[in-house]
């Protein structure tokens, strides 16, 4: 029997003020999943003596987030995970997951809530320490109006898609990465966002497969601390509906999207 339990999506907004009047905001949802064999009796016998209530977990996350002295989502998850294991020895392992609520800075004290792409992270810890840390950026939407093609693909009686030598390309993308040493040298998801956008801008791709492969290789070249990268990219490119000189209209007649995945590991 394999068991786990925990608390999902605890919302918190952490604000830190500095002497120069500048404020930093770290807003996110945090989930905790507790793993271990010490909770069997709660399932098999209804014996809750070893059970840490999920409401207690919520309170722990909120209170211990105040004590965190860093400024990254990854660091906060590791801080909380270690705190759970130290405070509750009955927990054999914990998996902490965080999803950023993105606030973009407008001034030293003013921020705007953005609903687009956001950072994510997962940290798994056991008695031996940090087992794995995975960072990511999800819901990234990128549109490139020229500099992409899709030609020379397999054709048969079912194929109606025309070849396009130069096309707009509109993608939705999630990307995650793991570290060679999860304890140090973390890569910020905003930096990854900028690298992906730069690659999309200057690389002339023959397909989305070609594009994500180039993105992954550039990430591995830039950040030697990354051990593995995984992409999930959806093709949201619209179909042409009209053209008049330099003006073009595109539409989206079908809701189905192509899905392309890739995992690259450092050799």
What does each of the following model-derived ranges do?
Residues 1-267:
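N-terminal intrinsically disordered, cationic/polar leader segments
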